[in-house]
Design a protein with these regions (language model features):
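An amphipathic, aromatic/His-enriched active-site/gating alpha helix that lines ligand/cofactor pockets
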Residues: 28-41, 61-95
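Short coil/turn motifs at secondary-structure junctions
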Residues: 16-18, 49-51, 63-65
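Generic recognition of short, well-ordered alpha-helical segments
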Residues: 22-26, 57, 72
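Short, surface-exposed ligand-recognition loops at beta-strand->loop->(often short) alpha-helix junctions
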Residues: 14-24
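Glycine-rich beta-strand-turn "strand-cap" elements at beta-sheet edges
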Residues: 1-7, 45-54, 81-104
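Active-site-flanking beta-strand signature of metal-NTP-handling nucleotidyl enzymes
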Residues: 7-14
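Short, glycine- and small/hydrophobic-rich beta-strand elements in well-ordered beta-sheets
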Residues: 32-56
């Protein structure tokens, strides 16, 4: 089923309050760099809850799992990972294959 299907990462981050701004800047840098510099990155959304708080979510879509693995070697990801290492209370990562997508 996975052959030829886009690879999706869904990550929810619980950010330490004192690291919120730094994490936010690093998240935007990673998202922008991923879409701009990686042909295998199809979409990278940075989300915040409507009720506020210190949570973020990433919705990332790659052409393949290999494209995601390549993403983790990019300079913008390494900068983000360095910030996340000290900015997070917790994170939850889920991996999916996109079976169908629709957008307007």
């Amino acid at each position: 089923m996975a052959d030829g299907q886009p690879f999706v990462i869904w990550v929810v981050f619980d950010v330490k309050p004192e690291a919120f701004d730094r994490f936010y800047e690093a998240a935007l840098d990673d998202s922008t760099g991923s879409v701009r510099d990686e042909p295998g990155c199809l979409q990278f959304d940075v989300l915040a809850p409507t009720a506020g708080g210190n949570k973020f979510a990433f919705y990332e879509v790659y052409k393949s799992r290999d494209a995601f693995v390549a993403h983790m070697e990019m300079p913008h990801f390494k900068r983000f990972a360095a910030v996340a290492d000290v900015a997070l209370n917790d994170k939850n990562v889920s991996e999916y294959y996109r079976l169908q997508g629709a957008a307007k």
